[in-house]
Amino acid sequence: MATKKAGGSSRNGRDSAGRRLGVKKADGQYVIPGNIIVRQRGTKIHPGTNVGLGKDHTIFALIEGRVEFLTKRNHKIVNVKEIAST
């Protein structure tokens, strides 16, 4: 009769689900107040005018308008430009 010692169990083989981070509204896209523009860890992109910053560093629109991304002094900034009423 063949004998074989029981194999040890592996402690690997797990992974956490992705956190769905990133830009949710592109440059020039229309937003309404409360729309999430960017989900991020830390302020990789900084808030500009007419946007708010959540406690988890989520950037969201405060007014109705169009999203605008720009770079100032090596900082990426996101603004919401108000749509001119005609």
Swiss-Prot record:
Q: Does the keyword Ribosomal protein apply?
A: yes
GO function terms (MF aspect): structural constituent of ribosome
Ranges for region Disordered: 1-24
Q: Which Gene3D superfamilies match?
A: 2.40.50.100
Name the keywords, alphabetized: Ribonucleoprotein, Ribosomal protein
Protein's GO biological process:
translation
> What are the record's GO terms for cellular component?
ribonucleoprotein complex; ribosome
Similarity comment text for this entry: Belongs to the bacterial ribosomal protein bL27 family.
Name of the molecule in the record: Large ribosomal subunit protein bL27
**Species of provenance:** Rickettsia conorii (strain ATCC VR-613 / Malish 7)
What gene does this protein come from?
A: rpmA
